[in-house]
From Swiss-Prot:
S-S pairs: none
Entry's family note: Belongs to the class-I aminoacyl-tRNA synthetase family.
NCBIfam families: ileS
Organismal lineage: Eukaryota, Fungi, Fungi incertae sedis, Microsporidia, Unikaryonidae
EC id: 6.1.1.5
Short sequence motif named 'KMSKS' region, residue ranges: 609-613
Organism (species): Encephalitozoon cuniculi (strain GB-M1) (Microsporidian parasite)
Protein name: Probable isoleucine--tRNA ligase, cytoplasmic
Cross-referenced CDD domains: Anticodon_Ia_Ile_ABEc, IleRS_core
Cellular compartment(s): Cytoplasm
């Protein structure tokens, strides 16, 4: 595969063709059969839109983890899934057909409407497959699942029936977030996904009492931001523990919380105080009389309830139980209604008033705020605007209303303890999601609304009598066929809504609702395999038992459920992660997944949301076609976005990965391939052991991180190793490798290609096939490596220290140093003795001297380390006093062992020690060792510097001329003195024979000389 001057995008396309031609993914699946299972669940996206960076991110995470565990020796099923039902699809059809109400769908016919939905569900599936393939993700579309397939839907029915048979499904009325654009209620986690800042009315409304209170004919004052709910007012709520004050305003008397009066009426004087408890039961005049008949049921009275707060408003709450959950609960609490009773709720599914509210009938409620306030202007004490957070429909981006609706619920609230226990069994990355966000969501979980008043979805499999007094829950297609006497080929609404079941002389008809699509996606671990109807070996969930069952059942559960790994975005803590967790906990008493990687959001570089309209981000195809998928993958997984943080996407970041990882890797590969045919020399060189140890440490560290699902450090580890390989080993042994010492490099490159397979699948394959044509690199298991420290690492530290001293003292690396003195323990020096020549060469030092370190070489200062001392506050002050009195000798002894003074043990971490070397030269202490350099120059060293500078210039001229490493050149410069100096230190051919390849100018001794570079023919 390897070719010089390769285009990396073309390399990736070549690898794609290799995978297609050899059916590499399919063969990898065949090869792993019979291995221990690693189970992965793929969260289903909708195919009604094109994939974006969020999908590329989650796809990269999923592919990286599953590739890694495949190469760890596991059998990993990788199947793609499609979310086909629900609001996203219906909303697209509503826009396409101009549908704005439920009635229009019914007029059109559910069958025709659902046919339209079915027609667009897989609209972009081919584009999805192309992008997923180009990303390098190995996943099966052929064996994937679709939530609209009857096998999947039948399994969902079975899950529903299991819950129903356990008494976990019930029908009730609840005030819920309601999308008037989509004509359906939303769950609480859906309503939390799209809050916006909006401007709403902020009004004070007077509610006159029917009888005097304390000698005053007065009105209670309530604050509201929803004037449209005033026609449905049914009560006022106060807190029994609050004090309320009577005050006069414009010759009328009013009552509100004593501490809130000054907020709205600055000069008001409190005339009388009364407790909230004393107000309970008082009757008042409501703003509108549309529901006056409810007065005889106890409505239009003051209720005392603890939900009323004094942080804003007036301490008096206008209650419209048809539109406020707390209001509804207060009415239940006071016995005015029973749970699930109907109350006034005169708003239809499109957010328009019904005929019950005659004056505003047919109008959208929020459009009526001004008219309502105008009609009751004599009761309006304040009319202002307020900007506050308000929930919008996540799909239609329209304001939600809170509205009483009939609904089907899963009982979750009673099982919170089980949900929390199972959460403890899950490894979350990052971990704070587990202990904060997800834990808090579970702790406050409410019963789950699972029904939607829509059309394109899995129908709720309940057939009920007209009065709902009896129900039949269907758990399979066969069961419905048996009860109906009909052959069933599809279980969407249009095919089964007309089925009437007759039993014991009664008629049962199906309820109208469909299941929330989140219920479907939460059922995917079972429905993707058509559980419990499928008995296929390898994906056998047919014996998965809600009660545990025999040993064979337990074995199957262990092999196929729960998932070892899932990964999606942070928003899924209230979406897919939650629904998976609820269903598995309720049915099987265990979590649905054991490890989860939670990613954040990919934003534009300016920190704003990526927007096609603003064009504030590069198209993914541009990134693929400019830098390649590998660079994008590594950029994404090396960022905080894989730990639930947001990422400001930078094209420059992708380019940097290409520059710092892929290109040095390619150059190292090329250098080896150009020289591997040279007869091996059989020698062993000092740094062979080091580069082997460096690779082992890299592979060991990477494996350790990945087994903990910590992806973000992969790039750092890879860059550190590729630097060791290209900038140290190859650079230092370039001549030796050309001469035949290439076996170690070849073996390292081969193993590096294998280890990098999950992260850079394209270039890993390209590299591996160039080294070892044949089987895919992705079939190879990871090498077994150990972690350890090689002595050359200390030599590298010494080299870095000398270079740092040069830099801080403005001494060029081309300037030779007369000597560098290493002061350290004898054991440290013994460890680096084999690398003294390498240290001298890398530091451009003529002589490396050694002195064993002792106390007399340093002036010691010491001070307390507060960060360490504060861990034990009982001894902190005493230790600080002791440390401040330590002598230099005592402080020095702390470097090797603890010190006991006045009965207190002082540890090394308790102090900050500064060692200043006693010498007049350039010196610095570096922890385990100290360095002194002698930069005095003699004539020979000056000439050496001149030679190195000219040699460096020639290397740069070669590069700019496009010459390769192995090209022999002749240099022409008409300066005999310079040529004489350079020839003493470097093997450079001078002359003017060959093909002219480059020109330049070089300054020597104040004169500028022309330089020509000729390539030998």
């Amino acid at each position: 595969m390897y070719r010089k001057n390769a285009n990396f995008v073309e390399c990736e396309e070549e690898v794609l063709e290799y995978w297609r031609r050899n059916k590499s993914f399919e063969r990898s699946c065949e090869r792993s059969r019979g291995r221990e299972k690693f189970t992965f669940y793929d969260g289903p996206p909708f195919a009604t839109g094109l994939p974006h960076y969020g999908h590329l991110l989650s796809g990269t995470i999923k592919d990286t983890v599953t590739r890694f565990f495949y190469q760890q020796g596991y059998d990993v099923d990788r199947r793609f899934g499609w979310d086909c039902h629900g609001l996203p699809v219906e909303y697209e059809i509503d826009k396409k057909l101009g549908i704005s109400s439920r009635a229009e769908v019914l007029e059109m016919g559910i069958g025709k409407y659902n046919a339209e939905c079915r027609g667009i569900v897989m609209k972009y599936s081919s584009e999805w497959e192309a992008v997923v393939e180009r990303l390098g993700r190995w996943v099966s579309f052929r064996d994937g699942y679709r939530t609209m397939d009857m096998t999947f839907m039948e399994s969902v029915w079975n899950i529903f029936k299991e819950l129903f048979s356990r008494g976990l499904i019930y029908r009730g009325f609840r005030v819920m977030p309601f999308s008037t654009a989509c004509s359906t209620p939303l769950s609480n986690f859906e309503s939390n996904q799209n809050y916006k800042d909006v401007s709403d009315p902020s009004v004070l409304i007077a509610f006159p009492l029917l009888k005097p209170l304390g000698g005053y004919m007065l009105s209670l004052v309530a604050w509201t931001t929803t004037p449209w709910t005033l026609p449905s007012n049914c009560g006022l709520a106060v807190n029994p523990g609050f004090l309320y004050g009577v005050f006069e305003h414009k010759e009328k008397f009013y009552l509100m919380h004593v501490d809130r009066i000054g907020e709205y009426f600055k000069d008001a004087r409190i005339l009388q105080r009364v407790s909230g408890r004393e107000l309970e039961g008082l009757e008042y005049e409501q703003p509108f009389d549309y529901f006056e008949e409810y007065r005889k049921k106890g409505f239009f009275r003051v209720l005392a309830s603890g939900f009323v707060t004094d942080t804003d408003g007036t301490g008096v709450v206008h209650c419209a139980p048809g539109f406020g959950e707390c209001d509804y609960n207060a009415f239940v609490e006071k016995g005015l209604i029973r749970e699930n009773d109907l109350v006034p709720c005169p708003v239809d599914e499109n957010g328009r008033y019904t005929s019950e509210v005659r004056r505003y009938a047919g109008r959208y409620v929020k459009d009526c705020d001004k008219a309502i306030l105008s009609d009751i202007r004599d009761k309006v004490l304040m009319n202002q605007r307020i900007v506050h957070k308000y929930p919008f429909c996540w799909r239609s981006d329209t304001p939600l209303l809170y509205k009483l609706v009939p609904n089907w619920f899963v009982k979750v609230k009673d099982h919170v303890d089980s949900l929390l226990r199972n959460n403890e069994k899950i490894n979350w990355v990052p971990p704070d999601i587990k202990y904060k966000r997800f834990h808090n969501w579970l702790e406050n979980a409410r019963d789950w609304s699972i029904s939607r008043n829509r059309f394109w979805g899995t129908p709720i499999p309940l057939w009920v009598t007209e009065d709902y007094s009896d129900m039949i829950c269907i758990g399979s297609v066969g069961e419905l066929e048996e009860l109906s006497g009909r052959k069933i080929d599809d279980i969407h609404r249009e095919f089964i809504d007309g089925i009437v079941i007759h039993r014991n002389g009664r008629e049962y008809r199906r309820v109208e609702e469909v299941l929330d699509c989140w219920f479907e996606s939460g059922s995917m671990p079972y429905a993707q395999d058509h559980w419990p109807f499928c008995k296929e070996s390898g994906v056998d969930l047919g014996s998965l038992s809600v009660s545990g069952g025999e040993e064979r059942n337990k074995k199957l559960v262990k092999e196929n459920f729960p998932a070892h790994f899932i990964g999606e975005g942070l928003d899924q803590t209230r979406g897919w992660f939650y629904t998976l967790h609820v269903i598995s906990s309720l049915l099987f008493g265990q979590p649905a997944f054991l490890n989860v990687v939670v990613n954040g959001i990919v934003l534009a570089e300016d920190g704003r949301k990526m927007s096609k309209r603003l064009r504030n981000y590069p198209d993914p195809s541009h990134i693929f076609n400019t830098y390649g998928a590998d660079s994008l993958r590594m950029y994404l997984i090396s960022s905080p976005v894989v730990e639930a943080e947001n990422l400001k996407f930078s094209e420059g970041g992708v380019k940097e990965v290409l520059k710092t990882l892929i290109i040095p890797w390619y150059n190292s590969l090329g250098f080896y391939l150009e020289n591997r045919d040279v007869e091996p020399d059989g020698r062993s060189l000092p740094m062979d052991g080091w580069i082997t140890a460096s690779f082992d440490n890299f592979a060991w560290s990477l494996t350790r991180k990945m087994r903990k699902y910590e992806l973000s450090s992969v790039l750092t580890l890879a860059l550190r190793f590729i630097d060791d390989l290209s900038n140290w080993y190859i650079r230092m042994y370039r001549k030796e490798i050309r001469a035949g010492h290439h076996a170690v490099l070849g073996e390292i490159l081969k193993k590096f290609s294998i280890v990098m397979g999950p992260f850079t699948p394209f270039f890993s394959e390209y590299s591996y096939q160039s080294l070892n044509p044949g089987e895919s690199v992705h079939f190879q298991e990871y090498p077994v490596c150990k972690n350890g420290t090689h002595p050359f690492e200390m030599a590298k530290s010494i080299i870095a220290a000398v270079r740092r001293l040069r830099e801080t003292n403005s001494i060029s690396l081309k300037t030779p140093l007369k000597s560098a003195t290493l002061m350290s323990s004898s054991s440290l020096y013994e460890g680096i003795k084999d690398y003294i020549d390498a240290i001298k060469t890398e530091c451009n030092v003529l002589e490396l001297l050694y002195k064993e370190e002792d106390r007399s070489m340093f002036d010691i200062t010491v001070k307390p380390n507060f960060l360490s001392l504060k861990k034990d506050k009982a001894t902190m002050k005493k230790k600080m006093k002791v440390i401040q009195g330590l002598t230099g000798d005592q402080a020095y002894s702390l470097l090797s062992s603890p010190l006991v003074v006045d009965g207190l043990e002082i540890l090394r971490d308790d102090v900050l020690i500064v060692k200043k070397i006693r010498c007049e030269g350039i010196a610095q202490e570096f922890g385990d060792f100290s360095i002194i350099i002698d930069n005095t120059l003699d004539e020979g060293m000056v000439k050496m510097k001149i030679a190195r500078e000219f040699h460096s210039y020639i290397q740069k001229l070669r590069k700019s001329a496009g010459l390769r490493v192995g090209d022999d050149v002749v240099v022409d410069i008409q300066c005999p003195d310079l040529k004489g100096i350079v020839s003493k230190y470097f093997d450079i051919s001078f002359g003017s024979l060959g093909a002219l390849s480059g020109r330049g100018e070089y300054e020597f001794d104040g004169t500028l000389y022309p330089v020509s570079l000729y390539k030998k023919l």
